[in-house]
Amino acid sequence: MRSLLETLEALKAPLPAGYVVYRQQGGQQIPYIPWWRVAELLDYHCPSWEWSVTSIQTCGQYLVLTGRLTLHTADSSISREATGCELLDCDSYGDPVSNAEAMAFRRAAAKFGLGRSLYDKAARPASARPVQGMR
């Protein structure tokens, strides 16, 4: 089992090729990591990680889910919480709960450094590019 420092350094490393996928949003291709790839990286770097949903609420037309990601390392355990949301009447892939949970899970992992560069708009101009044929 790695120390906390070693685990955090490993999670901040560049993402393996093929782990980043793109989805269309607002005329741009937005990079993201699917939740199962996040779980795969956590399994590799910190196999004793733990995820729990701490609350599910509705707010107007949205379902808001809060989850807690805990990393258990050789010298400590540390948790980060994050939220995810989805329209209650979503017409995208999945359902509101699983979509919101996937978002919360990815965001909690990003708080540990995993894929954080995808959230840095200044560092991703080559990644977030306009969709072909759209303005």
Q: For each predicted feature, which ranges?
A:
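Positively charged, aromatic-enriched nucleic acid-contacting surfaces
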Residues: 2, 33-133
